Amino acid sequence: MAHTSTDYMDLEARYGAHNYHPLPVVLERGEGVMVWDVEGKAYFDFLSAYSAVNQGHGHPRIVGALVDQAKTLALTSRAFYNAQLGPFEKAITERFGYDKVLAMNSGAEAVETAIKLCRRWAYDVKGIPANQAKIIVCEENFHGRTSTIISFSSDPDSYAGFGPYMPGFERIPYNDIPALAKALEDPHVAGFLVEPIQGEAGVVVPDSHFVSKAAELCQAHGVLLMADEIQTGIGRTGSWLATCGDCGCQTGRCERNPNTYTRADILILGKALSGGVYPVSAVLADDAIMLTIHPGQHGSTFGGNPIAANVAQAALSVMEDEALMLNARARGNQFREGLAQRIGSLALIKGIRGKGLLNAVLINDSPESSTAWDLCLALRDAGILAKPTHGNIIRFAPPLVITESQMEEALERMEKVFTQFEQTL
């Protein structure tokens, strides 16, 4: 029986597909912002399963919702009603201000669902001729890895060697309002699918007016704005949604401040909606869009199952009751300001950017270099887990439950790692 980290890594290499390149650490336990490897060493988790663990590892209320429901009724399919789905649907639609929600499992499934909704609306409501609807997307996007989604990816790692590709998508530069305006001149455009902050691209934060201006343009052209908030939503950027802007969400409730909030026609959620314990995703829209899909035209055996619904309700309640978006804002400021003071002047550092607790450090080296990877190995040795993205960028996104003192300790460790690393160059 395998016991050491090496044993477990060897098992994965022998029996698992080689579609990931994990940091060499084998985890077996987590609590709050901390995780432990099989040898018992503790680490600060600064990835949060790509922002799926916003409420912290093993939150007792969320785990309790999972266990209690699993003991009672786990799965019915949607062939029958269940007693948890309706209450969840009411809670999430009221939370974010939409008429309807369609529950799915993974983020990629939710994006696929949004694409189908947009196309169906385009044909039934907007009147675009059959099979001619187009959806605008952005360069450097990441919305998943299904065959449809990779068809509009600009990342060769995602799409190369997996054609033929699905037609009906047009890419424009991110954060480019004039390019969007020009693309929207095509009467066959049905939707604009966009990340309010591009996470996988390296935490690219657009101009503050980008999403709101995009919404205005979409409305003027009768085009649906589809916000992919799978990674940015549920408090990660310091508000319930990144499209809330800097509204504040001071009470822990989604206040939808009309001066800052941009309302997407289709809202896509996932990751932290699960509380980090069970796959849950959701697509929200009003009746004019959602009710274009009828029975038999879309569905999922596990989507909206009793466990998922119960877990998601608990995950949302924890966010509100503990006002975690407020902590994300405070600790995010602490992270960026503290790191800039400590390492901002190093030649190794090209920049520090982000919003809330979704942040990135840009390493002053080429994307093809191993510098960011080597830094993550050094951070691991210092008890901090993070992962490079796009070669020379390190993303830092701890659970939103991280305390001020924990952040301070993590910053001190990071300062030591980056400073010592530069001295070896």
Cite the ranges covered by each PLM segment.
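Conserved N-terminal phosphate-binding loop of PLP-dependent enzymes in the Aspartate aminotransferase
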Residues: 2-425
